[in-house]
């Protein structure tokens, strides 16, 4: 006999707590920042979970100093209780820097990058989600747009290499569909069960020179309960780009986009291996590969390959897998109420993890060259729905410290 959809979901692990909690929590703290090639200043971080005892979560980072601007988000704004909700993200930064490595793929060195600096970066993300069966099934539609201006190129130490005059503008738009099957005992803090999240995005071209491609990503996580109230998580992730329309693939055009003038771009297109031209040609080849093959979900940052900076490894295909032991050594319910922080403690958690990943331009080359991360940390699982993370991760290029407000392996945007 065929089971109905509600019956099939009811056979999964029983939810161990309310899935639409309204327990409030907040965190506010200032912190200095120093961004190579940009400058320094002060940022103020603010988070409010289940704002005013609703399901709404709000997050805001304000920057003062050389990188003035703000990053903010709101999540779980239900317009139909326990059924339909909105989420949104806003980025508005007056000065930014992006690391651009000498080559896509896995073979660039740690300091083999330039910093692309711009005076403006804006990004808006809007998502509407349908939630069913106590959040065991969620489907979402997503829209994202971004705009930026690049005006100079620095080396990895912050020294000026080239001025881009007039500034080079870039813009992009993405429309996506998300589907998540959550066959676990809790949506925000799972300890047993299985979770599958799939995304399907169309990155549209804003002009004739830009590529247009589909991006499919799938993340599968299995949670094995251990030590009573703890869990051992195993995660697999795959992301693939498929180009529908190529962008420009001409070397001279790509060199002009790197900031070279007409004369130098022409010279380097005829002598790409010369010592003076090679760095620019390598960067131009990155652009050509991106325009020809598209770009899958990158590796690096707080979500996957945590010992590497964000977007460290990029190509048309991505493979990632990892495991993480989450030991909840204190699960007593305690109210924490300080001036800068308030929440209900649900678990104090120690974690150790290992991760490995690979990217490549051709799918058959995935796994030929890999990079790994391993580390550990402490977490506080709050009743407001947030998981406050402090971790140290290390790998082939050194160590990274992570301070974050959600579990890893969740982001596919």
Where are each of the predicted segments found?
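Outer-membrane beta-barrel initiation region
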Residues: 8-88, 140-142, 165-191, 296-306, ...
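Residue-level signature of outer-membrane beta-barrel architecture
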Residues: 34, 48-50, 76-78, 130-134, ...
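Transmembrane beta-barrel strands of outer-membrane/channel proteins
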Residues: 32-34, 44-46, 58-64, 86-108, ...
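Outer-membrane beta-barrel "beta-signal"
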Residues: 177, 378-380, 398-413
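Transmembrane beta-strand segments of outer-membrane beta-barrel domains in Gram-negative
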Residues: 13-14, 96-249
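Gram-negative outer-membrane beta-barrel proteins
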Residues: 36-40, 52-54, 66-68, 80-84, ...
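Outer-membrane beta-barrel translocator/channel fold
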Residues: 63-131, 158-160, 233-298, 397-407
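C-terminal outer-membrane beta-barrel translocator/porin domains of Gram-negative envelope proteins
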Residues: 180, 187-343
